[in-house]
């Protein structure tokens, strides 16, 4: 959080790379202080709403839960297809702050509704690469079938860039497979696209 604060103080856009998704709560801390409200745009296979995982409150499985410890943070998640029973009560209790576009409902996603949800908001984008379908992104610690494909992912990011103010981003959970460079290039291009769309439509 101290590094992102220094970057913000210089009025530079912070793009942070994990490592684990557990970096995100620290990454957003300076934005929580700067803005009255922050909308976390979250791409992932997992909800990451556990209170703790193996006794660790700041686990990758608790990343979004820790972000929601900040009372001015709301979450819109895309691609979720794995959630534990322990996360369900918290999700139900906080349904006013958490909106999930479930992977199983992809054909019914209402992206016009999403556009309205983020309109003119300050958005922080966090992308766990296991949100992508395992057929195009097996190079991650917990790959899952049934996820996001390339073009639909870019479409969501582009809608966000056009209709909100993306203030920062992180991309995480790449676990390279020796000899298979295409997955590394995919993540590099994802970062390039996030930055390109953000600055193409950047609001002052």
Regions found by a protein language model. Name each.
Residues 1-204:
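Conserved alpha-helical scaffold segments that buttress catalytic/binding sites
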